[in-house]
Amino acid sequence: MDTSFFPGNHWLFFSVDLLVFLVGLPLNVMALVVFVNKLRRRPVAVDLLLLNLTISDLLLLLFLPFRIVEAACGMKWILPFIFCPLSGFLFFTTIYLTSLFLMTVSIERFLSVAYPLWYKTRPRLAQAGLVSGICWFLASAHCSVIYVTEYWGNATYSQGTNGTCYLEFREDQLAILLPVRLEMAVVLFMVPLCITSYCYSRLVWILSQGASRRRRKRVMGLLVATLLIFFVCFGPYNMSHVVGYVRGESPTWRSYVLLLSTLNSCIDPLVFYFSSSKFQADFHQLLSRLIRACVPWTQEVSLELKVKNGEEPSKECPS
């Protein structure tokens, strides 16, 4: 990797990955709790799809510490090499799972509004489970190229190129990698983007004919969050695939726009939040419980500190 592209660039990677981990992990854990409880009470297809998206985000976040360690070490891979392709495989798989599941959610939302009677007569939950399995298969099958690339040409390869992990590539590796990246940009990004854009544009038009203001506002929030993920988080990264294929090389700036892709695990909870009013209510309820659980503990600690310092605890609230 060209370290002259950004002075001290590994600290940029370290800071962004650490921030995403600290913000995204608690948000997605809370979303996981909400969706599990919702599915236990009343299973709905869209909630099953969003649950899979949450699990995908959590996988990315749980393996993000590997990238944090890598960045702290100057973008050199010091961990056992077996974790290099594994962390890369899970990292990129979850990125493309996001685009696929956002597409399926948009289709589900569109069908429920455009064809409500037909929608209610279909076994949506079973279909959602099947679609989820297909999404996991498509994303993981495409991203398995990471294993092919890292071990290509030498079955006993014990370290990446120049001691890095999936950052620098030999010519024989690029010959395999670049065409697959182009296909991923088309199949796993551009196609989902087109389908998602169509579904939400139609959904907004239908709701503009007579839906309540609150429902229109929720759908617009869902639309903005979804398009933000596609265009800001995933757009520049997938454009690097097209540029790399045309130029016959892995662009130097690819790793930097990849940072934007990691932000999706922090933005996805916005999609969850605007997905339904029931999720908003359950999320607020869970958040209130957490706050109530933490506040007495902080008050108790504060009281103990006052006693230790010889101060008399206040019995009245200030007016």
From Swiss-Prot:
Subcellular location: Cell membrane
Expression sites by tissue: Expressed in the sympathetic nervous system.
Major localization class: membrane
GO molecular function: G protein-coupled receptor activity; lipid binding
Topological category with respect to the lipid bilayer: Multi-pass membrane protein
A Pfam family annotated for this UniProt entry: 7tm_1
Outcome of substituting residue 40 to Q: No effect on activation by propionate
PROSITE patterns, A to Z: G_PROTEIN_RECEP_F1_1, G_PROTEIN_RECEP_F1_2
One cellular component (GO) term of this entry: membrane
Disulfide pairings: 84-165
Gene Ontology BP, a term: regulation of norepinephrine secretion
Transmembrane segment boundaries: 16-36, 44-64, 99-119, 128-148, 184-206, 219-239, 255-275
Regions of this protein lying in the Extracellular compartment: 1-15, 65-98, 149-183, 240-254
Keywords: Cell membrane, Disulfide bond, G-protein coupled receptor, Immunity, Inflammatory response, Lipid-binding, Membrane, Receptor, Transducer, Transmembrane, Transmembrane helix
InterPro entries xrefs: GPCR_Rhodpsn, GPCR_Rhodpsn_7TM, GPR40-rel_orph
The keyword Cell membrane is annotated on this UniProt entry: yes
Family: Belongs to the G-protein coupled receptor 1 family.
Record protein name field: Free fatty acid receptor 3
Designated gene of the protein: Ffar3
